[in-house]
From Swiss-Prot:
InterPro entries: SH3-like_dom_sf (IPR036028), SH3_domain (IPR001452), SH3D21_SH3 (IPR035468), STAM (IPR050670). It comes from Macaca fascicularis (Crab-eating macaque). The keyword Zinc does not apply. Residues 1-60, 132-501, 536-605, 672-692 are annotated as: Disordered. SMART domains: SH3. Transmembrane segments: none annotated. This is SH3 domain-containing protein 21. Residues 177-186, 378-396, 490-501, 542-582 have a biased composition (Basic and acidic residues). The lineage of its organism: Eukaryota, Metazoa, Chordata, Craniata, Vertebrata.
Length: 692
């Protein structure tokens, strides 16, 4: 603004100077030009001055191209004929500031012209000048403002676009170790990419493929840290292959993955899509966790990841996948269920994603741990896919797998199982935190995650309905828990205890001890108790046991599961009994050990999925809703009570104030009455005296 004003003055001066002072300045007065307004105030004065003193405007007149008005501060009496008389308050128009004597200006006041001392006047900002300057400033200001506004308006749009692009991508880019890289990929994919991952399996896979390598690298590092002995790293490689290729058949482990890919095709629904994503990612469940993880995995899952890292990157990733699913509640439940399902096998994923997550992690670990497990899972996955077609066949296959790999799976399951427990806890929090509904669904996941075994049982629980038949049939034998099964759980415990320590999954280790505790270990702690625990699970107790894994919400959720899971409970008792007895880890691990029993269960679950998701979720949701509603009701009651108390206090205060005011009014009235009476009495007396 200042610059523009400064520039305008010289321009005006130049124009005035260029114009002949006599004519041109007066005629045009600068009004024709937008910049001239500053000169317009006194266009005629300069010409008069020039005519009186000079033929052409001298250079020093440039400083005063137009008369400036100064206010007189002090009176001045002229001592010479050419001096100007000044009176305080008068306005002097300065015609020239350059005269023969320094400190003297030439000006005009009240129609007289002369010189006067410059220290007798104060230059108030001339009104005439100010008006043009303001106009100019307004003109220039709008020009500048639009420029400023334009970038502002454009910036918000850009920011919004960036946020829009990054926001969806972030939400869908499961915050994984490589969040930045994922964000970049997600940005490229844009919100569409995020929706693709959630909505359609193939696009989701593509995205996850791009991101999974990063996650896998992180997860592979985690696995290496957790236990080099674990095959997870090896498994990861196949998983990477799987992630790189939607059809993960390339590797034997990928074969299950490839089957899972078909499942994605089969499963267009969000849950199935998730399942597909999970299965695709679950070629090694860890892969599914990783693949979905990148897209879906939320930060909470990441939190679980540390545990998972300790246990197995894969586990954490599966959990992440679950978590990812959780972020999108609708798909989350399904995806979580699916994720868990994959643990048991792909079947579990689809049928019982909720339960599967834990199972998934455990199986994933097992897969990572042993190719056999992966093969079993592959077959299991195939069974799972087929399970929709025939759960019995899947169960048989699973049983055969379990029988074959019971020892190896037990060992491996122990390792994977331990990790699942930690993830479960974190997931449990995440699931519960994220949403009651998810909680209901996730609680099973959480329970499963909390304790691999628990998760297994949870998976089995999802299976329960399908398993109910098979498990019920197998329940007696399983509940009997042949010495072999019990021994295997014990062995599994030992292995888990050993592997878990390796995994450094203290949480799992804890669970292992819990195995004694079996987070549910409450009963699970001992396999001997496991049968009891399983029975409780079959009953509500088993649920509660699982609930411990999940937490309270998980218990409630598990209870619904158990309601459904009673079958699973039987199976769990049968399969999980040893596994749960082992502890959550044992269960997950046992499931892997009996991997397949759980897998069969999970396969059954595939059939159950529809039942489980509804009944199971409904039960969980009901339990969660009831507890949450109770809490809300209590909080509301408290709030109402507080409000009532506060209102009462306020009312009492108001009443007191009213009473005090009434009393004051009465007093004032009394005083007024008394005063009036007193005043009247003297008047009467005075009147009487006057009359006399």
């Amino acid at each position: 603004m200042v610059q523009s004003e400064l520039q305008l003055q010289p321009r005006a001066g130049g124009r005035a100077e260029a114009a002949s002072w006599g004519d041109r300045g007066n005629d045009k007065g600068g009004f024709g030009n937008p910049d001239m307004p500053s000169v317009s105030p006194g266009p005629q004065r300069p010409p008069k001055l020039s005519s009186l003193a000079y033929d052409s405007p001298p250079d020093y007149l440039q400083t005063v191209s137009h008369p400036e008005a100064y206010r007189v501060l002090f009176d001045y009496q002229p001592e010479a004929p050419d001096e100007l008389t000044l009176r305080r308050g008068d306005v002097v128009k300065v015609l020239s500031k350059t005269t023969e004597d320094k400190g003297w200006w030439e000006g005009e006041c009240q129609g007289r012209r002369g010189v006067f001392p410059d220290n007798f006047v104060l230059p108030p900002p001339p009104i005439k000048k100010l008006v043009p300057r303001k106009v100019v400033s307004r003109q220039s200001a709008p020009i500048k403002e639009p420029k400023k506004l334009m970038p502002k308006t454009s910036l918000p749009t850009v920011k919004k676009l960036a946020t829009a692009a990054t926001g969806p991508s972030k939400a869908k880019t499961s915050r994984t170790p490589s969040r930045d890289s994922q964000k970049l990929t997600s940005r490229d994919s844009g919100p569409n990419g995020g929706f693709q991952s959630g909505g359609s399996c193939p696009p989701g896979r593509k995205r996850s493929k791009t991101q999974t390598p990063q996650q896998r690298s992180v997860s592979s590092q985690e696995e290496e840290h957790s236990s080099p002995a674990k095959a997870p790293s090896v498994k990861r490689t196949p998983m990477l292959d799987k992630t790189t290729t939607p059809e993960r058949p390339p590797a034997p482990e990928n074969a299950p993955g490839s089957k899972k890919i078909p499942v994605p095709d089969k499963v267009p629904s969000p849950e199935k899509t998730l399942t597909l994503g999970d299965k695709a990612s679950i070629p090694g469940n860890s892969t599914s966790g990783k693949i979905p993880g990148p897209d879906i995995v939320p930060t909470p899952e990441r939190m679980v990841t540390p545990e998972d890292k300790a246990s197995i990157p894969e586990n954490s990733i599966p959990e992440e996948a679950l978590t990812v699913d959780k972020p999108s509640t609708p798909e989350r439940l399904s995806s979580v269920e699916e994720a868990s399902g994959p643990e048991v096998p792909p079947m579990d994923k689809v049928p019982d994603p909720k339960m599967a997550p834990l199972g998934d992690e455990a199986p994933t670990r097992e897969k990572v741990l042993t190719p056999e497990l992966s093969e079993e899972e592959v077959s299991t996955r195939d069974d799972t896919q087929f399970h929709h077609f025939s759960s019995e066949e899947a169960l048989q296959k699973v049983k055969s797998f379990v029988a074959k790999e019971a020892p190896s799976s037990q060992e491996k399951a122990h390792t994977p199982e331990a990790p699942p427990l930690q993830p479960p806890s974190s997931e449990k929090c995440l699931g519960e935190m994220k949403c009651p509904l998810v909680r209901g669904d996730s609680s099973p996941h959480q329970a499963e995650l909390k304790s691999g075994p628990a998760s297994r049982p949870a998976l089995e629980k999802p299976h329960p309905q399908a398993e109910a038949t098979t498990l019920l049939e197998e329940a007696p034998s399983k509940e009997e828990r042949t010495p072999e099964e019990e021994a295997s759980p014990n062995e599994e415990r030992l292995l888990r205890g050993e592997v878990l320590p390796k995994e450094g999954v203290a949480s799992k280790g804890e669970v292992l001890p819990k195995e004694g505790v079996a987070s549910k270990g409450e009963v699970l702690p001992k396999e001997g108790v496991a049968s009891k625990e399983v029975l409780p699970k079959g009953g509500v107790a088993s649920k509660e046991e699982v609930l411990p894994k999940e937490g309270v919400a998980s218990k409630e959720e598990m209870l619904p599961k158990e309601g459904v899971a009673s079958k699973e409970e039987v199976t769990l008792k049968e399969e999980v009994a040893p596994k749960e007895e082992v502890p959550p880890i044992d269960t997950a691990f046992a499931q892997k050990t009996h991997p397949i029993k759980p897998s069969p269960d999970s396969q059954e679950t595939l059939t159950l999925p529809s039942l489980l998701p509804q009944n199971y979720t409904e039960n969980k949701n009901e339990g969660v809703d009831v507890t949450s509603l109770r809490g809300e009701v209590e909080s509301l009651r408290r709030a109402l009570e507080l409000m009532g108390v506060q209102l009462e206090r306020k009312l009492t205060d108001i009443w007191e104030e009213l009473k005090s005011e009434k009393e004051q009014r009465q007093r004032l009235e009394v005083q007024v009455m008394q005063g009036t009476q007193k005043s009247q009495t003297p008047r009467i007396i005075h009147a009487q005296t006057q009359t006399y």
